[in-house]
Amino acid sequence: MSEYIVEMKHITKRFPGIVANDDVTIQIKKGEIFALLGENGAGKSTLMSMLFGMYEPDEGEIYIRGEKVKLESPNHATKLNIGMVHQHFKLVSNYTIAENIVMGMEPVKKVLGCIPVVDMKKANQDIRELSEKYGLAVNPTDVISDINVSTQQRVEILKMLYREAEILIFDEPTAVLTPQEI
C-alpha cells in the first residue's frame, strides 16, 4: 500500500489557447492538510476539478490509495470517498438543508410494509446529529434560499461528511466568507 492517499503525477491539462496545468505532481499523505496557493488563473481549481472527476487530464496519472484511477465523473470520485466544496456551491435553492445533503443517498423506510419512501424524519435527525458532532450548526429543515452564504458553505461541508468522504477538497474556501467568519 502506498504511503500517499492522493498522488497526481505529471498532470497536464490544456484548454483551447491555454495550458491550465503543465506537468504538475503532488503527493498527499493520509491525514495531511495540503494547501495549493497561487494567483488567479494559475490552474488550482482545474487541478482539483480533475481530482474530483470534473475534467480528465490530457497527460499524467492519478492514484488514490496507491491505485491508479481514471476519474470519469464526480459520482466516480464520490464512490472513492472524495468530496469537494466548490467555490460556487452546488445546492438546490428550493430544497431544505437536509434534502440537499442526503440527495442521492436518502434514508428509506417502507410504507405498508413494501412501498419505499424517503424517510425525511431520519434524514433531519441524521443531519442534526452530524452538524452537532462537527460543530457545523444548521437547522436541517431550513430552505437553502433562506440561509446565508456561510451556512450554505456548512451545508456543502456536511454533504461531504454525510457521504463519508475521506479526501476533502475545498476550492476557494474563504471566498464567500466575511473577515469575521474566516
Task: Please report, for each region that a protein language model flagged, where it lies by residue.
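Glycine-rich phosphate-binding loops of nucleotide-dependent enzymes
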Residues: 2-182
